[in-house]
Amino acid sequence: MMKFAYEANAWGGVVGTPGAVTDLGSGFYVTPGDVHHTIEAIAAAGYTGIELFDGNLLPFEESIDSFVSAVQANGLEIAGVYTGGHFIYSDAQEDELARFDRSIRLAALAGARHYVIGGGAVRSTGRRAQDYETAGAFLDTVAERAQAAGLIPSYHPHLGSIAQAPDHIDALFAATSIGLCADVAHIAAGGGDPVAVIRKYADRLAYVHLKDLDHETNAFLPLGAGDLDLNAIIAEVVDAGYHDWITVELDGYEGDEDDAAKRSLTFLQNVTFTDPARP
């Protein structure tokens, strides 16, 4: 059964913890602002789940139960926790793994279902073939640790990362066994066809991020406000056998955050999520 969640970064965007400038082991994504306001806004919009960055769990590291209680008091579940890393620098992986271990522990203690990993650094000289092999092996290690903690790991292709364009995605997924978090707007903005990517990796589809896109400006928009064929995309998700959290993410949107969340949920509530070919 499909359930709908919303990413907290719609209210405040994303920054990084400052220690990461000099210490790879301390870098976390963070949405600035009042996380409790965001929880309330997502619940008020009608969603039943929330996704947030691992860095937003750091203030609750010693009191995670209080955070979980606040989420549950608003009728929400933690659908996922999002993180990222470099992956490609072999001599830095020990420090990166220490950070991932901390991140995984936080996500597991919070009761998250999905553990979403973005990133993969791009060198100043560009992407190298060996970087995909190095990143793929690293992602396998992180995925194994996440699974051992009871999480469902997936990799999220993203603009500006090692896996931006379709051939980048193919190169990375040939080198790793981690599942796919299909962010349909990032895939499209990177030059890909979300339907084709989901179909190609249907047996590895582990999680879904939905947002709409204006192809002309590459602006991310509420569902139904852009030019993606979201009905065809959702039909492909269903055809892949996926029946789990659908998380709406709207980073970088300049309109009203509360209204955008409600508009996207209204769109989803008018979509058919069943496959008529199935009994």
Over which residues does each language-model region extend?
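Hydrophobic faces of well-ordered beta-strands that scaffold small-molecule active sites
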Residues: 2-8, 50-52, 78-83, 115-117, ...
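Active-site beta-loop-alpha junctions enriched in small/polar residues
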Residues: 9-11, 53-55, 83-88, 120-122, ...
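Active-site acidic/histidine proton-transfer and metal-coordination neighborhood
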Residues: 73-77, 89-181, 189, 258-259, ...
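Glycine-enriched alpha-helix->loop->beta-strand junction motifs that scaffold or abut catalytic
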Residues: 46, 173-180, 201-206
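Short, hinge-like loop/turn segments at secondary-structure boundaries
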Residues: 24, 68-70, 96-99, 133-134, ...
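Short, hydrophobic-biased amphipathic alpha-helical segments
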Residues: 249, 257-268
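Gly/Pro-rich active-site loop or hairpin
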Residues: 14, 18-32, 126-129, 166, ...
